[in-house]
Each structure stands twice: as structure tokens, then as C-alpha cells.
From Swiss-Prot:
Residues 186-238 form the HAMP domain. InterPro entries: Bact_Sensor_His_Kinase, HAMP_dom, HATPase_C_sf, His_kinase_dom, HisK_dim/P_dom, HisK_dim/P_sf, Sig_transdc_His_kin-like_C. GO terms for molecular function: ATP binding; phosphorelay sensor kinase activity. The gene is hssS. This is Heme sensor protein HssS. The keyword Metal-binding does not apply. It comes from Staphylococcus aureus (strain bovine RF122 / ET3-1). It comes from the Bacteria. It is a multi-pass membrane protein. The lineage of its organism: Bacteria, Bacillati, Bacillota, Bacilli, Bacillales.
Length: 457
């Protein structure tokens, strides 16, 4: 129905104003009916009886002149004689609705309280209802016999100036209120429109242009969070571009190498060289296969909603299996692996945890000097499980340490890895609600420490 928020807020606000005015009128009408009507009836009846008392004591020569004088004093009067003849004084009534039964009762000396007994009408205020049954009536004795006199104040005449004042006041109130509603709505909508334009810029890929935070209310908070979102999206976009560049590089380099080896293979007839080229191609394709596997694993970790973490894992046994699997690589470098493992159970994803711990051991074997040692420990600590793996090797600079867990980061250009192992390990540990830290001692002993929650109970 509303195509703009501006129109919606403006229409809603104006509707609230008009609806409030209507409800106020109805409530005022109810208040008059239940609280003021009886007292108003009594006051007018008192005035009419005082008029009768004056008429009886002063005995004016022409009673009609007396009623005419009352009419000039802003009263509306209707008299009915015993023949049913009606005479009106003052401003005319809007409608003659008085029943004959009420007239007869007054002629028989019964007071009439039409104002007090006026039925309630939701949208008609009895105070202003200018009809003959909304009057009070008593019997007057004249020289020509009894007459029934019905009277009510002439509200229209009495409050004519006030009604004009009130009408002008209400019109100005509505005009000013609606004008302020439109102006305030525009003030609210303006920053929303700027947000809309900023959103369109985001869609077009502009992550650099911020929006100015102009307020301190909810819209100001929205502006602040929009800027934070813009910064985050910009970082994600940079990471995406960096990721694509790295993947392209990691794939292009071995493919170029394979292409070169195939060319050499075609041109040589030396069996030894041909076998060497074939072996090199096999090694490179194996590395490409490993890269593909790790990229798929990264994608799985980034979209982890479908992953389950309900495997009951015997962590110490898992570590023993990993050590046994990598023992051959350790033996080739004459490395000693020392393991101090407590018996610990853990609830998680066994496949992923196996991958994370394997990456750390493979990394330790790779960077430990020949004849060195690798220390592995697993223990409880309060409500946590602590896993540490330490090895001696070359020192790591603070610059390298700060980027160890970045995707595709390599310590050296001559490193034949793809730089994803530690990034994958960190993601897996965080998905298990754990942390991983790297420390280095003065003796060039590097240590990776994994802390996991003890969730087996």
C-alpha cells in the first residue's frame, strides 16, 4: 500500500492524531454523560424555578414579554398552554422532539428533567444537542391558566465567540501537528535514504566509502553498525581476492612445471631422464591432489553448519595412531618422538581432530633438525584438555610468528608446502570451541599448545 517509509510514517502519525481526537471526543462525551449531565440539569432547573418565583412575585403584565426577555438573555424557551399551543422564545430549536406525554406531565405539575434523562449517544454530546426534549420543564401559573415552560441555555449563542476561538485553535493545532509530523518524518527518513544509497554502493562493490554517523539514537547505532559491516565486508572481499590469487598461483606454478616436464619428456629419448621426468610429474600431481583435498577441507570448515561434533574420541589413542602413521617420516630424519599422554575422552569430530593433530606432527617433523626430538603431552587442567607439541629447530622471527596461521603463508619461497596446514588446524580447533597458541623459548624450542573444553562428562 505504501511505497515509501516516508509516506507510511506520515500517514500513521496523522492517523494517530485524528484517531486520538476522535477518542478524546468520545471520552469527553462519556464524561459529560456520567459526571456533568445531572448537575447541568439541576442548575438549569434552579434557574427556571427562580424565574417562576420572580414571575409569581413580580407579576409582570405580559408574561410573553417576560419570556422574550429571558430569550434575549441566551435561553431557549418553549411554552405550551392547555390547548397545546406552542410558543418559542430566543433562538429557535433545531428540532421539536418533546413528547406529548412529557408536556402533559408538566401541565399536571410534574417537573421535567430532559437534560438529565437524555439517552447517551456516542457521537452526539448532550450538552450541545439543541432539541426540545433536551430541556428542563416546570408548570407556570398565569392569569390565563397553567402553562408548561421548557428551557435550556442557548449554547450556540453563549459560546459563539468561544466556538470560533476553539475552531481556529483546533485547525491551527491540526495544521501545525501535521506540518511537524511531515518535517520530523523527513528528518527520520533522510539518514535511512543515505543508508539505502550506501547499500547500493556496497552491492556495486564499493567497500571504501563510509557513511557519516549523524545521530546518537537507534538510527545512529544503525549507521555505526553499517560502517562496521562495510569494513568487515571489505576485509572479506580482500581476503577473497587474496585467496583467489593464492589458489591461482598454487595451481598455475605446478601446472607450468608439468607442462615443461612434458615438453622435455617428448624431446628426450634417454630412459633415465624420461623416468626422472615421470617421477617429477607424479610428485607434482600428488601435491596438486593434496592441495585440492585441503581446499575442499577449507570450504567444508568455512561452511560448517552440516558438520557433526558428537564422536566419542579417545584422544590419547588418536595421538598414538597419528604417531605410528608418521613414524617412518620421523625415522628418516632420526628423530625421537616422546609422548606423555593421559587417558582422556573428548566429544567432537574425530576426522577433523585427527587432521588438526596430524598437521602439527607433520609440521614438527618437517622443521626439526636431523637427530632432534619432538615432545608431545596430553593432560587435564581444571575443566580443559591441554595438548602440547614441542620441537627444536631454527628460530622463528616475530614477523613470521604473526602470520603462522594465515592461509597460503609460507615461511620460505623454497617451501614445497601449500601453506594451508596451520590455517586448517586453527579452524578445526576453533570449531571445537578451543584455542591454539604458538610460543618459542630462548633455546629455539617451538611449542604449539591446544586448549579444548573438557566436554566428556
Amino acid at each position: 500500500m505504501f511505497k515509501t517509509l516516508y509516506a507510511r510514517i506520515a500517514i500513521y502519525s496523522i492517523t494517530v492524531i485524528l484517531f486520538s481526537a476522535l477518542i478524546s471526543f468520545v471520552l469527553t462525551n462519556v464524561y459529560y454523560h456520567y459526571n456533568l449531565k445531572a448537575s447541568n440539569d439541576a442548575k438549569i432547573m434552579k434557574t427556571l424555578k427562580e424565574a417562576r418565583q420572580y414571575e409569581q412575585s413580580a407579576k409582570p403584565t405580559h408574561i410573553q414579554q417576560y419570556f422574550k426577555h429571558l430569550g434575549q438573555m441566551n435561553y431557549q424557551i418553549m411554552t405550551v398552554d392547555q390547548k397545546g399551543h406552542k410558543t418559542f422564545y430566543g433562538e429557535p430549536f433545531r428540532e421539536d422532539t418533546l413528547s406529548q406525554n412529557a408536556i402533559n406531565n408538566v401541565l399536571n405539575n410534574k417537573d421535567y428533567h430532559g437534560i438529565k434523562d437524555k439517552p447517551f449517544a456516542l457521537f452526539v454530546t448532550g450538552f450541545f444537542d439543541n432539541v426540545t426534549d433536551n430541556t428542563v420543564g416546570i408548570n407556570f401559573k398565569t392569569k390565563d391558566g397553567s402553562i408548561a415552560v421548557f428551557m435550556r441555555p442557548d449554547i450556540g449563542e453563549t459560546f459563539s465567540e468561544f466556538r470560533t476561538f476553539l475552531a481556529v485553535l483546533l485547525m491551527l493545532l491540526l495544521f501545525i501537528s501535521i506540518s511537524l509530523v511531515i518535517a520530523s518524518t523527513h528528518s527520520i527518513i533522510r539518514p535511512v535514504k543515505k543508508l539505502k544509497l550506501a547499500t547500493e554502493r556496497l552491492i556495486d562493490g564499493d567497500f571504501k566509502t563510509p557513511i557519516k554517523q549523524t545521530r546518537k539514537d537507534e538510527i545512529g547505532t544503525l549507521q555505526y553498525h553499517f560502517n562496521k559491516m562495510r569494513e568487515s565486508l571489505g576485509q572479506v572481499d580482500q581476503m577473497r581476492q587474496h585467496f583467489v590469487q593464492n589458489v591461482s598461483h598454487e595451481i598455475k606454478t605446478p601446472l607450468t612445471h608439468i607442462h615443461h616436464l612434458l615438453s622435455e619428456l617428448q624431446q628426450t629419448s634417454d630412459k633415465t631422464l624420461r623416468q626422472q621426468y615421470i617421477n617429477d610429474i607424479y610428485t607434482i600431481t600428488t601435491q596438486l591432489s593434496g592441495l585440492t583435498t585441503e581446499l575442499l577441507l577449507l570450504s567444508e570448515l568455512d561452511n560448517h553448519q552440516s558438520l557433526l561434533f558428537d564422536d566419542k574420541i579417545q584422544v590419547d589413542q588418536l595421538i598414538k595412531d597419528i604417531i605410528r602413521h608418521e613414524q617412518f617420516a620421523a625415522d628418516e630424519k632420526s628423530l625421537i618422538i616422546l609422548a606423555d599422554l593421559e587417558s582422556i575422552n573428548f566429544l567432537g569430530n574425530q576426522r577433523l581432530l585427527h587432521q588438526a593433530l596430524s598437521n602439527l606432527l607433520i609440521n614438527a617433523i618437517k622443521y626439526t633438525d636431523v637427530g632432534g626430538a619432538i615432545d608431545i603431552a596430553l593432560q587435564h587442567s581444571h575443566n580443559n584438555i591441554i595438548f602440547t607439541i614441542s620441537n627444536d629447530g631454527s628460530p622463528i622471527s616475530p614477523q613470521v610468528e604473526a602470520r603462522l596461521f594465515e592461509r597460503f603463508y609460507k615461511v620460505s619461497k623454497h617451501d614445497n608446502s601449500n601453506g594451508l596446514g596451520l590455517a586448517i588446524t586453527k579452524s578445526i580447533i576453533e570449531l571445537h570451541h578451543g584455542t591454539i597458541q604458538f610460543t618459542q623459548s630462548n633455546e629455539y624450542i617451538t611449542t604449539f599448545t591446544i586448549t579444548l573444553p573438557n566436554n566428556s562428562h
